Amino acid sequence: MGDIVIELFPNHAPKTVANFVELATGAKEWVDPNIGEKVKTNLYDGTIFHRVIPNFMIQGGDPLGSGMGGPGYNFADEFHGELNFDKPYLLAMANAGPNTNGSQFFITVAATAWLNRKHSIFGEVKDAASQKVVDAIAVAKTGANDKPVQAIKISKVSFK
């Protein structure tokens, strides 16, 4: 569908940004749930956006592709007073409750104030071309559990 360029917020969410970058580059060890072993490889390349909800968000970062996978560890939430879900195109950690961040993330496509202080915001999709890609993913046809009928794959995560 195209590239999604994201500006990360290391000054506002340093641990969350570090976790994302280290998982994306293979610098951090994680447990691959597909094989049950510790690995030190890029987690995100080849994964899919496994959950898409129009007018809300697109979610990825699960090595299983089901919404049930992660890196085999959790880390604490990071909230910053300057970061709120008051606009679309924010990058945040998906979780299963307080301090359960792992590898799954989502990008909003609308203001989602009810998520404030529940999910760590650590980046933003700022350019119009990238926002169009996010919007296109957000309206993909979905089936059970909001999973796109046709896989939408993350081919490569890279950093400048």
Give the predicted meaning of each segment.
Residues 1-160:
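Cyclophilin-like peptidyl-prolyl cis-trans isomerases
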